[in-house]
Amino acid sequence: MNYLVNYCKISFYFLMSISLSLFLISLKFLLMDLVYFIEWEILSLQSMSIVMTFLFDWMSLMFMSFVLLISSLVIFYSNQYMEEDYNINRFILLVLMFVMSMMMLIISPNLISILLGWDGLGLVSYCLVIYFQNVKSYNAGMLTALSNRIGDVALLLAIAWMLNYGSWNYIFYLDMMKNNIEMMIIGGLVMLAAMTKSAQIPFSSWLPAAMAAPTPVSALVHSSTLVTAGVYLLIRFNDVLMNWWMAQFLLLVSGLTMFMAGLGANFEFDLKKIIALSTLSQLGLMMSILSMGFYKLAFFHLLTHALFKALLFMCAGSIIHNMKNSQDIRMMGSLSMSMPLTCSCFNVANLALCGMPFLAGFYSKDLILEMVMLSYVNVFSFFLFFFSTGLTVCYSFRLVYYSMTGDFNSSSLHPLNDSGWTMLFSICFLTVMAVIGGSMLSWLMFLNPAMICLPLEMKLLTLFVCIVGGLMGYLISDVKLFFTNKALYFYNFTNFVGSMWFMPVISTLGVINYPLKLGLYSYKSFDQGWSEFFGGQMVYFQLKNYSLYLQEFQSNSLKIYLLSYMLWFIILLMLVVLVN
């Protein structure tokens, strides 16, 4: 076991040191406005050369530093969380492969090398989702892999289309993509790929299903790697989104995703799925502000969200670990008494998610909402932004109400306490980052902050929405023994909203089961029904009837001759009468 512990610690120290180094280098690149474009010639054969390209700027270096920071803390956290697992060695290697794939995607200005990282993420995520080998995990892994395959196909088509232009380095063609109609096809395909990876409507169903993976994987995947890959790719292709119809389409889809995830989380009782739906809501927020042209704001929220979302998952993992793998929040309650440190960190992460002033989420989320108020958006988009913000606060307060207040609803013989120092170290480190990360990044990234001049009512609108959302979260979860749950009064609505607008059913049964049933009905109606009746069997029966009819003629020859003689005699008689 000591060998495995050291294995985790070596990975932790190695990744943490690289993360700090990259962060300092990214600050230098940011302040001096440096960009390094590196070409590495892998193979040169006569007139042919294979060249690998890397793009290092402040954005890629800073994102890599955050990915490595969270990865190192997740691996250190896994040292205790997965201590009873025999295959922890394999688990750490899979996580490292996952991080390597993400690195490849971040520093690539070339669609081919992006596809390597993109496919690497898809493949390793499948291996991690099915890590706990049971039927539910296999189904979730298959749904994750097949949903992401659509994006892979879109990227392959974009690569094929770029053959028309002589290079796969998309970064040279971004200006061309804004005006050239044929290059807009590449932008559309990349947008489709990003929508599948970042789980936008109609590809949202795989993200909550991926919660079948171990909790440390969820902390890594849903904070800074897999789901943010699509957002990061669109940040790189942000010039393409200046095309008005693509931007309008993305704004509508991402706004609806944000709204759908916020509503769904208010009717969910699985702890990890609630946090997964909050990730989906924040991804919709990033995509929508990106479609409005504020790519730096989207990147800023991407980084701050990575900090508090990883913290949320780690605290949830600690709670699940102590609850003996129970994830139902109705079984929890009064956890703040038995796990005070974990619950304190959990509440800090929740408040950062809600946009509580001076925490990490406030600096990015409040800025995004103020820029929305300054921009020219219609009432529907405005409603989606602010209503979704209220829903975020609503499900966060509901989650705290169910899990941390009231009475303990599980076995009374179940001792609970804070986890060991290994898990608590990662949790406390990220708590500090969730408190100071937003202000630190805002001072570093926006050297000349924009002047935002708004009336007092609009300035206070965000705070008002958060307060109303918190009150609603308390009221809808206030359930007593003599007071039924209000959701039961609207069962059909609850069923529709709680199942993510039936998207998991449509994505699985809708793609496989219903077409198969349609084929079965067609087979019975046409192949075994009308076509068989009018086709093969009908021809056989008709020929058989004609044959029998003709045989009747042959067997009754005397009668037929007499009948024909009489007919012809009558006809001749009539002709004679007519002539005379």
From Swiss-Prot:
Pfam families: NADH5_C, Proton_antipo_M, Proton_antipo_N. The keyword Nucleus does not apply. Keywords: Electron transport, Membrane, Mitochondrion, Mitochondrion inner membrane, NAD, Respiratory chain, Translocase, Transmembrane, Transmembrane helix, Transport, Ubiquinone. It is a multi-pass membrane protein. This is NADH-ubiquinone oxidoreductase chain 5. Changing residue 378 to K: In haplotype 24, haplotype 25 and haplotype 27. One of its GO terms (cellular component) is mitochondrial inner membrane. The chain crosses the membrane at residues 12-32, 50-70, 92-112, 113-133, 153-173, 183-203, 215-235, 244-264, 274-293, 298-320, 343-363, 367-387, 427-447, 463-483, 496-516, 560-580. The lineage of its organism: Eukaryota, Metazoa, Ecdysozoa, Arthropoda, Hexapoda. It catalyses: a ubiquinone + NADH + 5 H(+)(in) = a ubiquinol + NAD(+) + 4 H(+)(out). Belongs to the complex I subunit 5 family.
